Amino acid sequence: MMDTDKDDLPSATDHSEHESGDAVKVEGGASKTASNSKDPSRPRRKKARRACFACQRAHLTCGDERPCQRCIKRGLQDACHDGVRKKAKYLHDAPDGALVPGAQGNFYNQANGLPKISPTEYTQNGTNNAQQQQQKSGTIYASSTPSYNNNNGTFDTNNATNTVLPDSAALNPGPFTATPASPTFSISTSSAMPSLTQPTNDMTSGAGQGSFGAFFDPSDPALFNFDLASMNFGNRYGALEFGMLGHMATGAGDTPPSDNGNQRGGSVGQRSNSQQFGNPPGAFTTESPSQQSFMFGDPVLNDWSGGQNTNPRMNVGSGLYGQGGGGGGGMHLLQQDAPHAYAIGSNTFASPSSTTSPHATTIAPSQFDDSPMKTKTVISTPHLRQQSLYNSNSNKRRHREPSAIYDSVKEPYSYTGGFHKLIAFIKRRFSPPKTVRIAKALASIRPSFIATTKTLNQDDLIFMEKCFQRTLWEYEDFINACGTPTIVCRRTGEVAAVGKEFSILTGWKKEVLLGKEPNLNVNTGGGNNTSSQSDSTSSSIRGGAGGRMRNQEPGPNNMAPVFLAELLDDDSVIEFYEDFARLAFGDSRGSVMNTCKLLKYKTKEDMDSVNADDSRWNSAMTHHIVGKGGIVGEAGMNRLGFKDGRVECSYCWTVKRDVFDIPMLIVMNFLPHI
């Protein structure tokens, strides 16, 4: 029969106690009936957060104190420590000490009975007088928290959550620097440890403070200003992981990265004379106080964490964790705005050619200057670089605003007239077998066009044109920023927008393609031996393509946008319309990749000059077109296909639909074959 105290009430699983009503012996020798466990007047014992190892094995009710009362009665107070619970699969790699639900669950009485330690009692080898007294007394306090290795041995981090950093230690921790994403770290004790100037917490354990390990334990939520109690997590490890993700994401979108070294602070670490990219992101070391902290070796992290921020609150600079003597003024400036715990801030990751001092730097007043005259930064992150390009071009681009589109469009576009002009052009240019193939392709999608447009009224058609113009307004930026020859056409094949590279490649001027200048092209892809045929059919071609007769005087009634069929040779036109019939009402995000031959813009005078200079072309022109490295400049790009009037290309195109799910425009990109 186990000895029990008066207040030691049995639990439901205590098999060593008798049932209610049985007599048990107490210390005085008298017998007393045990309390009924179902008696409502029976005092309730507060449930412990975690039972000790002995009580857990015996299935007894334990308490929060260490050693617990049961272990004291049984003489097991020296070996009383928290029991190990079975962990979930996703927590198998988590340290046991990180799974405590509360902030001080198993750190209650680690320092109980130990004398208070003054800051001057720390020695250089990482031990203190309290540890020596503890070893002499023979008392052993076990812990389930992990131990970290250093050059002198091991140390644990039991009291990491009890540690309270003073202001001076938080802002100037010496050579120690921690990365929040690393669960382990190593410490080199080649240099003497700096003595503390202020006491920490009265409950601080000597074992935890012996090597300053608790100051920079990544599992300590105090280093990140985490309130684990408000996160509603069942375990401390999950709450810490969730808080760390939120901490890393805070302010990431508000800090544009920069490659300019003088606009980065050094809150994580600064460049050292002897160590620039030597350490991996998951580890950090210790150097002498005159040297700087480690530096991340990951360039992606450098771009993410660095940069100039327009918000002074986030622009803590290098004074937050600087280690030199030159940061006095900057330190006083930043104590109000700096975060009260370790945070990922802007860094001074200078290039090898930079003139930035390797020692600690202070924040210059120019870093808080939002003047537009300051040095332009070079952005390496693709997403932010695109935003910077957009902002830099916004001041000098576009003389019109998007609102002008909705005010200027008053009538719908006549797609019916455009299709009639296209059919007339096809009949006059192509042979009957080729015309039949194109007509079959267009006839296959004609019912779909009728079904989608028959319910649209005048307002819908006007809105459709506004959508087209607004989308085209956005594609203008895409065309200007893309170095690939690009054109945008309506669903009828009429050119609506064109890039400069396409004009250089084909010789078609933008004004001619958009119908702002007369079209004098006579090249239909027949070659030099069919120049007479081209001359005989040029007038009919111009008439069939919308009333543009080559022998007529230029005028506003004789100019219209060029059809896509006028830019391709016969086989390419047939293949395009057969592919368009499959994609127009098919996959809304589909695209087509194929090869084609673009027709160069040639007037009658150009065709005559090519025939006369054929011998000179073979000897001289080839040298200007292609060199050892490919095309030489814009002139060489323009000379491609100048002899036969055709440029072999690979092209990719897609169909953009409007709100009525009707094909609205065709976007095409070309790459010439060199």
From Swiss-Prot:
Top-level taxon of the source organism: Eukaryota
Q: Per its UniProt record, what SUPFAM superfamilies does this chain match? A: Zn2/Cys6 DNA-binding domain (SSF57701)
Bias (Polar residues)? 120-148, 269-278, 285-294
Residues annotated as region Disordered? 1-46, 117-181, 250-321, 344-374, 519-557
Where are stretches of biased composition, namely Basic and acidic residues? 14-25
* A molecular function (GO) term: RNA polymerase II transcription regulatory region sequence-specific DNA binding
Gene Ontology BP term (one)? cellular response to starvation
- Any single Pfam family the record assigns to this protein: PAS_13
A cellular component annotation (GO) from this entry = nucleus
Give compartment(s).
Answer: Nucleus
Q: Which residues bind DNA?
A: 52-80
Keyword vocabulary terms for this entry? Activator, DNA-binding, Gluconeogenesis, Metal-binding, Nucleus, Transcription, Transcription regulation, Zinc
Primary location class: nucleus
Per the record, where are the segments of Low complexity compositional bias? 149-163, 348-366, 529-540
Q: Which InterPro entries match?
A: ERT1_acuK_gluconeogen_tf, PAS_13, Zn2-C6_fun-type_DNA-bd_sf, Zn2Cys6_DnaBD
Q: Which family does it belong to?
A: Belongs to the ERT1/acuK family.
Protein purpose: Transcription factor which regulates nonfermentable carbon utilization. Activator of gluconeogenetic genes.
The molecule here is called Transcription activator of gluconeogenesis PMAA_028970
